[in-house]
Swiss-Prot record:
This is Imidazoleglycerol-phosphate dehydratase. InterPro entries: IGPD_sf (IPR038494), ImidazoleglycerolP_deHydtase (IPR000807), ImidazoleglycerP_deHydtase_CS (IPR020565), Ribosomal_Su5_D2-typ_SF (IPR020568). Keywords: Amino-acid biosynthesis, Cytoplasm, Histidine biosynthesis, Lyase. It catalyses: D-erythro-1-(imidazol-4-yl)glycerol 3-phosphate = 3-(imidazol-4-yl)-2-oxopropyl phosphate + H2O. Its EC number is 4.2.1.19. GO terms for molecular function: imidazoleglycerol-phosphate dehydratase activity. Pathway: Amino-acid biosynthesis; L-histidine biosynthesis; L-histidine from 5-phospho-alpha-D-ribose 1-diphosphate: step 6/9. The gene is hisB. GO terms for cellular component: cytoplasm. Its main location: cytoplasm. It is found in: Cytoplasm. Belongs to the imidazoleglycerol-phosphate dehydratase family.
Length: 194
């Protein structure tokens, strides 16, 4: 089974996270940050990954450490659960509309970490959530998974809708990339390793 569990404790946060890449069972997500919980729930649904997260962070300061550390821990678990990446598609891409907004994600589980984030998030806050943390989250995921991740909002007006389209697109593109393809023998690379 392609699963992973990680507990990550720092002076700023305590994160418990588990994933099962091959189960769409209902996820349990409690980060203490309502907007992040909402986005992770959407990600889990659209990736068809069972995701369980419990986070306790120094949110009295702000949400930055918790958001980043959840991203780090998710990336570590994705990397572990993918193992040697044998027979996975490796690549995934999709567009996702959310009302007036259109989000795009393309990714490569190459082992080489990179993030391109092109999204004009015009509202700096959604409730208490700093929208600049969306990029921080995806940076942490990409760099700890070993993923080349491109995210773009092509257009839109509502900042919530823009961010939601990105999380859904990320989930759907990741599902495509992690799907095992019986036509792929070994890893999907001429190098023989990812």
């Amino acid at each position: 089974m392609r699963t992973a569990t990680k507990t990550r404790v720092t002076a700023e946060t305590s994160i418990e996270l588990s994933i099962n890449l091959d189960s769409a069972a209902e996820s349990t997500i409690a980060t203490g940050i309502g907007f992040l919980d909402h986005m992770l729930t959407l990600f889990a649904k659209h990736s068809r990954i069972n995701l369980n997260v419990k986070a306790d962070g120094d949110t009295r300061v702000d949400a930055h450490h918790t958001v980043e550390d959840v991203g780090i821990t998710l990336g570590i678990c994705l990397k572990e659960a993918l193992g040697d990446k044998a027979s996975i598609n490796r690549y995934g891409s999709t567009y996702v509309p959310m009302d007036e907004s259109l989000g795009f994600c393309a990714l490569d589980l190459s082992g080489r970490s990179y993030l391109v984030f092109d999204a004009e998030l015009t509202n700096p806050k959604l409730g208490d959530f700093d929208t600049e943390l969306v990029e921080e989250f995806f940076q942490a995921v990409a760099f700890n998974t070993g993923m080349n991740l491109h995210l773009r909002v092509l257009y839109g007006k509502n900042t919530h809708h823009k961010i939601e389209s990105l999380f859904k697109a990320f989930g759907r593109a990741l599902r495509e990339a992690i799907t095992i393809n019986p036509e792929i023998k070994g890893v999907n690379s001429t190098k023989g390793v990812l």
